[in-house]
Regions:
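Bacterial N-terminal signal peptides
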Residues: 1-10
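Extracytosolic ligand-binding ectodomains
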Residues: 6, 15-387
């Protein structure tokens, strides 16, 4: 079991503290993403603690645990360990398989609220009904449709598709295939791939023989996506890529840079008022606001804090009852950097509508309605456009 447990403490001994868990894959395929995501969540905790308005001036302790992202059993053990620390709620998990495993073992959760910044939702909906789970990461159903819209907008007539042979890849390719066929785009081939192979030259050769104006890669960058891009470029098979959200991280830009100038992708996110507010908060905290899922991580943490205030208690059941209350209308809109305002309004019995960095709104099933950004690549920077 690869597991770690460590603390970031935002309190003075004069005040009571509330523990909130952060259950991310700090080791494994997304280990380059999760540290900044955790720091972003902790920005919200720090903001609430500094306000001195949370309940009776209580402070937040964040308790981090490593879910690995690849080992469901390790994720379950990490969840048990973090819950044994008496956390009031959890920000996490992130990866689909680990989240499914944790949610399916209801005895682990003991009715504790989990808010995931990233775990895609369709295959988790049935499990959510048994537990208290919300996902700020928008669903693969919407993601596949957005990616199809981008493909059409780029005037791609024929496309080859390769997807990961896991739940994420299977769910996404089903939606994407249906959506692009309705747009009249010809699919030259659909190929699945095993994760984390060292060599994907045979898969790329198959894609090349089928042809196409571009290749859509529906998988994870750290679990084969990087190697597929590299093999495509090295062989001259493709130089234009349509990439799903899990292909996006800074390493992608650092490795390939201008070689992606013809390519496009999507991630969940927003360029609206909330995003601008979050950029200022993140910049002050030394965090890159354009990094994947940092806005969602801040929002997940903020919702837990506001739900505590709305219910007047850090009791687990009280938090669960108040997530929808603080995230959806009606109420005064609250943006990043305005948690003190939100806490004050709630203390006075007023209603709030937490808009956050990512236009937070949930269905009754706990699914994010969400918004998306189209990505283009310019050197080692992402260029974003609201979809």
């Amino acid at each position: 079991l690869i597991s770690s447990l460590f603390y970031s403490i935002f309190f003075s001994s004069a005040f009571s503290e509330i523990k909130i868990g952060i259950l991310f894959g700090f080791t494994g395929p997304i280990e380059t993403l999760t540290p900044i995501m955790a720091e972003s969540a902790e920005l919200a905790f720090q903001e609430a603690s500094d306000s001195e308005l949370l309940l009776d001036g209580e402070k937040i302790i964040s308790v981090r645990a490593d879910s690995t992202c690849t080992n469901p059993d390790a994720a379950s053990e990490a969840a048990k360990k973090i819950i044994s620390e008496n956390v009031a709620a959890i920000v996490g998990a992130i990866c689909l398989e680990e989240t499914k495993t944790i949610l399916s073992k209801s005895k682990i959760l003991d009715k504790i609220t989990l808010i995931s910044p990233a775990a895609s939702f369709p295959s988790l909906k049935d499990l959510q009904r048994k537990n208290i789970f919300y996902s700020i990461g928008t669903s693969d159903n919407r993601g596949g449709q957005i990616l199809a819209d981008i493909t059409k907008d780029k005037k791609i007539k024929k496309i080859a598709i390769i997807h990961a042979k896991d739940d994420y890849g299977k769910n996404l390719v089903k939606v994407y295939k249906s959506a692009i066929e309705k747009k009249g785009i010809i699919i030259t081939t659909i190929l699945d791939h095993e994760n984390e192979k060292k060599d994907y030259s045979s898969e790329v050769a198959t894609l090349a023989s089928a042809g196409g104006d571009a290749v859509a890669i529906l998988g994870s960058y750290e679990k084969g996506g990087r190697e597929i891009i590299q093999a495509s470029l090295d062989s001259g098979a493709f130089d234009r890529f349509i990439l799903s959200d899990r292909m996006i991280n800074q390493s992608l830009l650092d490795t390939f840079g201008n070689k992606l100038k013809k390519s496009s992708a999507y991630i969940s996110g927003s360029t609206g008022k909330g995003a601008n507010y979050f950029h200022k908060v993140a910049e002050t905290g030394g965090i890159d606001s354009s990094a994947p899922y940092v806005g969602e991580s801040y929002d997940a943490a903020a919702l837990i804090v506001l739900a505590i205030q709305a219910g007047g208690s850090a009791d687990r059941k009280t938090i669960a009852k108040n997530i929808i209350k603080v995230s959806n209308s009606p109420g005064v809109k609250i943006f990043p950097g305005e948690l003190k305002k939100g806490l004050d309004l709630l203390a006075k019995g007023k209603e709030i509508d937490y808009e956050g960095a990512t236009r937070v709104n949930f269905t009754n099933d706990g699914e994010a309605i969400g918004s998306f950004l189209e990505l283009k690549f310019k050197g080692k920077k992402f260029i974003t456009k609201q979809r």
